[in-house]
Amino acid sequence: MECRSLDLTIISAEDLKDVQLIGKQDLYAVVSINGDARTKQKTKVDKDCGTKPKWKHQMKLTVDDAAARDNRLTLVFEIVADRPIAGDKPVGEVSVPVKELLDQNKGDEEKTVTYAVRLPNGKAKGSLKFSFKFGEKYTYGSSSGPHAPVPSAMDHKTMDQPVTAYPPGHGAPSAYPAPPAGPSSGYPPQGHDDKHDGVYGYPQQAGYPAGTGGYPPPGAYPQQGGYPGYPPQQQGGYPGYPPQGPYGYPQQGYPPQGPYGYPQQQAHGKPQKPKKHGKAGAGMGLGLGLGAGLLGGLLVGEAVSDIADMGDMGDMGDMGGFDF
């Protein structure tokens, strides 16, 4: 397959549509062959350019010479407004057949051309200026080529690439074999003795009957033996704590605890009488409160009586019964 390199310089644009409501718009251009995303290249963003961006951005593409001469390749220029907050918005587009450019090729000379910019509705608004130059033909894949071409840019046809796929429910094969079945650690299974080919474990302590778990059943602790290091219980004096029963039953030797707020029952002796200082304190407080209330009432009553007396004395003065 014979290919050519295509050198482009996106120079500038003029009289474009202004899609920015406030301030000047920022514009950039995207170049591709037939709009294929795999061939897209982008210019820098010209800040605050308004309707007259200037880029002077260089880029290189590779085209299939036979497809270009058969007019199957189109060079597409998309002018876009850069808007980080509201989202980028298309301003215009230019489509140029590669064959048209190839027919204007004159050796190593770079040619500058200007094309009309089309709005999304098809109307012309503004112009785009760029320069181009084609390289010499070379065979794709040959070491004598000027550079390694971009396969996706050589033709508008989709070049199928081998894709590794796996059926649903199966992942990619692993480079390591699956681990053997059985315990994941290097220890033998619990309860197995390699030497005697039997069951092994911790020796059961004296006084504990054999059980399914590693702990003796409740209430099976010996009263006189115990663990090493602890002396046996004394026979005289106060009795020690009785052995605990199963979980959920009251402890032996002690009465069950009553609800919260009630006095607890004593195990020995007569029940203690509640102290009287609480009632005495309550009675004293009640008496003080009543006394204070009575005293306040008396004071108020006396004040009212004094005011009434002063009013009566004023009336007597009006009678004029005395002369001075």
Swiss-Prot record:
Biased amino acid composition, Low complexity: 166-175, 246-269
Protease keyword on record: no
One Gene Ontology CC term in the entry: extracellular region
InterPro entries reported for this sequence: C2_dom, C2_domain_sf, C2_SRC2/BAP
Domain of life: Eukaryota
Region described as Disordered: 141-281
Localization of this protein: Endoplasmic reticulum membrane; Protein storage vacuole membrane; Cell membrane
Composition bias, Basic residues: 270-279
Primary subcellular site in the record, as a coarse category: endoplasmic reticulum
Topological domains, Lumenal: 301-324
Protein's GO biological process: cellular response to hypoxia; defense response; protein targeting to vacuole
Membrane topology of this protein: Single-pass type II membrane protein
Transmembrane segment boundaries: 280-300
One Pfam family it belongs to: C2
Domain C2: 1-111
UniProtKB keywords: Cell membrane, Endoplasmic reticulum, Membrane, Signal-anchor, Stress response, Transmembrane, Transmembrane helix, Vacuole
Cytoplasmic-side segments: 1-279
Induction profile: By cold stress in roots.
Subunit-structure text: Interacts with RBOHF (via N-terminus).
Biological function: May act as an activator of the calcium-dependent activation of RBOHF that mediates reactive oxygen species (ROS) production and may play a role in cold responses.
Record protein name field: Protein SRC2 homolog
